[in-house]
């Protein structure tokens, strides 16, 4: 019995020690960049000559153990970073990575699974809240605004801007992340090690986000409808123009808020049972319409009611102004192209 109690106490102590160690590691990660775990070595007293009392005879000096005076020119303290370079992770099926000072790349097979990579990348950035300063969807290239990295192993957070692009080759797709700016505390940083580190970190966040989207799609059969939705022009029984989306009502209902916000329509009240959504439309800038690859629609800014109809495996969309007037045929056809692009660029949300 005494032996069992002693073993139980040992296990409890070991468990408490492990918990304290994990808690310490999770709260303070600065040890990752410190020599010997802390900066106590900076407080070591300097060497000085031995003060021999008068009358004491010292043994003969042996130079074998002398420590010659040196002047250190290397980095010390917080200036010295012992962290290894960050590496991009090849989490996606059939992928591999390449890292260089200029950029971090993910190379994938040119397969149907990777055909929506650009929209998936945009979804990751949207969910992270990263703002875009430049976008060219036609060439699948964008430049982010400044992104602040809150990391526990940095005393002062870094801010970065990145150029993210996708290049299609015969049998390969290349996702590239390059540096467009790096600063810390308002000061520009040109250290190639830090540039490569944050390129790899950004690429890893994109890869992890895309991987989560694909895992969600594989776990949920209905999620396969997260891809682009086909939108066509049509008319109701009275001949008024409307849009036809080739997807079931439930899918369209869930996808609409993100698509509407994408084109400048702020979503208000929603009623799933009646299929109605109120929106307040404010047009995007010329550059934003251009980045979407569509022309600015001619509808007026203001409040609209969007009526969604259930057509079994399809859905109908009809916009009605606050004065109760439906769109003209021209306006309806313009929104067909706009919403088709919006559904494509918000796929996965």
Swiss-Prot record:
Subcellular location per UniProt equals: Cell outer membrane
Database matches in InterPro entries: BamC, BamC_C, NlpB/DapX
Top-rank taxon of the source lineage equals Bacteria
Xref: Pfam families: Lipoprotein_18
* Swiss-Prot/TrEMBL keywords: Cell outer membrane, Lipoprotein, Membrane, Palmitate, Signal
**One GO CC term of this entry?**
cell outer membrane
Q: Name one process (GO BP) from the record.
A: Gram-negative-bacterium-type cell outer membrane assembly
Q: Where is the lipid attached (N-palmitoyl cysteine)?
A: 25
Secretion signal: which residues?
Answer: 1-24
* Covalently lipidated residues, kind S-diacylglycerol cysteine: 25
How does the protein's chain sit in the membrane according to the entry? Lipid-anchor
Instruction: Report the principal subcellular site.
Output: membrane
Q: Does the keyword Lipoprotein apply?
A: yes
Q: What does this protein do?
A: Part of the outer membrane protein assembly complex, which is involved in assembly and insertion of beta-barrel proteins into the outer membrane.
Q: Name the family the entry cites.
A: Belongs to the BamC family.
Q: How does it assemble?
A: Part of the Bam complex, which is composed of the outer membrane protein BamA, and four lipoproteins BamB, BamC, BamD and BamE.
Q: In its UniProt entry, what is this protein called? A: Outer membrane protein assembly factor BamC
Query: Which species is this record about?
Result: Photorhabdus asymbiotica subsp. asymbiotica (strain ATCC 43949 / 3105-77) (Xenorhabdus luminescens (strain 2))
Identify the coding gene.
bamC
